[in-house]
Amino acid sequence: MEAAVKEEISLEDEAVDKNIFRDCNKIAFYRRQKQWLSKKSTYQALLDSVTTDEDSTRFQIINEASKVPLLAEIYGIEGNIFRLKINEETPLKPRFEVPDVLTSKPSTVRLISCSGDTGSLILADGKGDLKCHITANPFKVDLVSEEEVVISINSLGQLYFEHLQILHKQRAAKENEEETSVDTSQENQEDLGLWEEKFGKFVDIKANGPSSIGLDFSLHGFEHLYGIPQHAESHQLKNTGDGDAYRLYNLDVYGYQIYDKMGIYGSVPYLLAHKLGRTIGIFWLNASETLVEINTEPAVEYTLTQMGPVAAKQKVRSRTHVHWMSESGIIDVFLLTGPTPSDVFKQYSHLTGTQAMPPLFSLGYHQCRWNYEDEQDVKAVDAGFDEHDIPYDAMWLDIEHTEGKRYFTWDKNRFPNPKRMQELLRSKKRKLVVISDPHIKIDPDYSVYVKAKDQGFFVKNQEGEDFEGVCWPGLSSYLDFTNPKVREWYSSLFAFPVYQGSTDILFLWNDMNEPSVFRGPEQTMQKNAIHHGNWEHRELHNIYGFYHQMATAEGLIKRSKGKERPFVLTRSFFAGSQKYGAVWTGDNTAEWSNLKISIPMLLTLSITGISFCGADIGGFIGNPETELLVRWYQAGAYQPFFRGHATMNTKRREPWLFGEEHTRLIREAIRERYGLLPYWYSLFYHAHVASQPVMRPLWVEFPDELKTFDMEDEYMLGSALLVHPVTEPKATTVDVFLPGSNEVWYDYKTFAHWEGGCTVKIPVALDTIPVFQRGGSVIPIKTTVGKSTGWMTESSYGLRVALSTKGSSVGELYLDDGHSFQYLHQKQFLHRKFSFCSSVLINSFADQRGHYPSKCVVEKILVLGFRKEPSSVTTHSSDGKDQPVAFTYCAKTSILSLEKLSLNIATDWEVRII
């Protein structure tokens, strides 16, 4: 039986025909809402029902056709956030509200009711800066800032709410017809998918009938929108037509098409909009299948017809309409009012949490393949990195390392002594990452399956039996991670006595957790499967992978008794997944177009909270040409998560297999990454404590520069580095836009400099990575690169001081032990600030709460843009001692180099240039 199952399941089960995925017009709730929207809005607010308390203002909304009352709640939340919830006032049964995503119950501010016109209500926050203008009939909400309308809700009358009904088809059809004015005659029942929906050979039986919701938002003056990952699409969201909405529905799409709005592995229902002077966000907290339509009306100027000799002209601001539609749940939306990009990032993280602080090793290079065959293969690949002087930090094992795809086991023939293998890696100060998927092989001799089944821990089918689907092990059941008891039990499986063969250098990779179900509808789980609390899968599909990663991260923390930071990579994700680890872009292809699309995909993830993200180097599917592989390593070295990976039917592609010259180029790219690790680690600390993305679109750093608003071929790392990867074959030049008319930019390798506010044609050879340091920044680097991050903890630092046009610079360094939670619990960290002004470089505390002893020294300082040759340079330490410093100066390049220094990184000191 085992052999037969293995023959049945192959790569082709995942490499499915794209026709098995639905487009919008094949989705019943989309068709229903689009059909209804041709009608006039029938919702009005009953302002005589208004009640207000410390938390919220509540009032009824009535559908004039069905007379079914809805309850609207408006909350003011600390930090300039408004929340709108709309639910049935008395539903037949509770409707699903997404739990566990918000870090806590948001802190509210009391809204003050102001007098409005007849038929309207005005609510203001305590400061009076923001106001909600509520119009009764038809129901509409305007969010006003400084007397300017920023967002209008339901201005197009697209509020849609299907109330729950009894399971009696004729009555249900009649009531739904009254509510929505949709033709629900018998011949139209099947097309509208009210009580059952057919797609291919699958029939989705809907026990609660239709339950979809929808609402429109008009963003005044905004034409540039971003967010709502995950799609293999441009960074700036595009206008959509009928049947062309952005789909948020987590799916296993092997070799996904690019520039396509179909949903792939993860969903973050969070959208940002930016214009000159303001950035805003809309967070639609719903975990069911969701579609988003976007339509921009450009600014127009028209003449008012009037009597008299002069016709007055009036300019109408552009506005963009965003229409959210979800299959089920309630309307629960947060409006983030900014006004700056940084403010919006903080507002969103206030709700969903910040990026988890990663262990330092995870910012190094990761080597993965489906699959490394056995312990000898792992040993040989590990030795290959040392032989070719290429640093790396983690070896990865895919599903073949297990016994027949039974997770938490080892193939005894291929990996007879996994602890010995891990001790080999430990001796090199490296780690091991293994895969653990959510499907559990149905096998009465597999202890994980038996224990989960005995305790009722699997997702159920409609009949209440364990749901069964096909995945890599063959017939499998799926753990119900929405159940807290399942998550607690699952996390216990990572304890060292339970997970035989594991050690404390073993970390985790969650894959196939959309969840992927081979031969299921759209390669996933039936929507009428049943979860904890008797909730249908349709209610929470997009949050399944979120819970899987949560449980895995908790397991790694528990095994160390709360002392060590976890590392967990997940393919599927939701809003808030940043709290638990990293995300990658899934099964990409070894094509230039996939290298190019990885940049906007990662930028979109980054601005929606998930800073720790990356794409498989070289493309997971197919065999990359050598030039493409080199360029991908160069791009990946400047992206947050840095992993090479390939599927099982590709040629081996370890970095030394492409000829000596290409090995050198890949080595240089990886070593550049390792040299910059102090800067990377400091950026992740800022993402963790201050909510600022590590990888940033240009518009985030230059919010008043229109040209940056739609750029996606270059980006910022933090505020100091601009990166423009080469993404075209046989390129000899790239056009790089250097923003900021008052900025100066320095080539990271050659130190050539340009004034900002212009496009520069940069020559590129195969060894060129176009990277530019922003004037006014100080970047900490390591002066030597070791075999892994573990070999570099005590190596010396260098500082790259790039002067601004005013001759000043500032930068930071964050340092801790790189692996534990002591930085959080015991304040064992070092946070230093470097500032250069008036020819003096000062090292001082950025945060005096932290203390972390370090013997590391600053050995070299490079000052770029120093305009005159010094007569002397001295260091001044906190004990009052002055020491002369040897220096070299190049008048042609304006570079001042200070070497052979020994300035302790943890103490205050100054470098004085005279």
From Swiss-Prot:
Its EC number is 3.2.1.20. Pfam families: Gal_mutarotas_2, Glyco_hydro_31_2nd, Glyco_hydro_31_3rd. GO terms for biological process: carbohydrate metabolic process; N-glycan processing. Keywords: Glycosidase, Hydrolase. GO terms for molecular function: alpha-1,4-glucosidase activity; carbohydrate binding. InterPro entries: Gal_mutarotase_sf_dom (IPR011013), Glyco_hydro_31_AS (IPR030458), Glyco_hydro_31_C (IPR048395), Glyco_hydro_31_N_dom (IPR025887), Glyco_hydro_31_TIM (IPR000322), Glyco_hydro_b (IPR013780), Glycoside_hydrolase_SF (IPR017853). Has alpha-glucosidase activity. This is Neutral alpha-glucosidase C. The lineage of its organism: Eukaryota, Metazoa, Chordata, Craniata, Vertebrata. The gene is GANC.
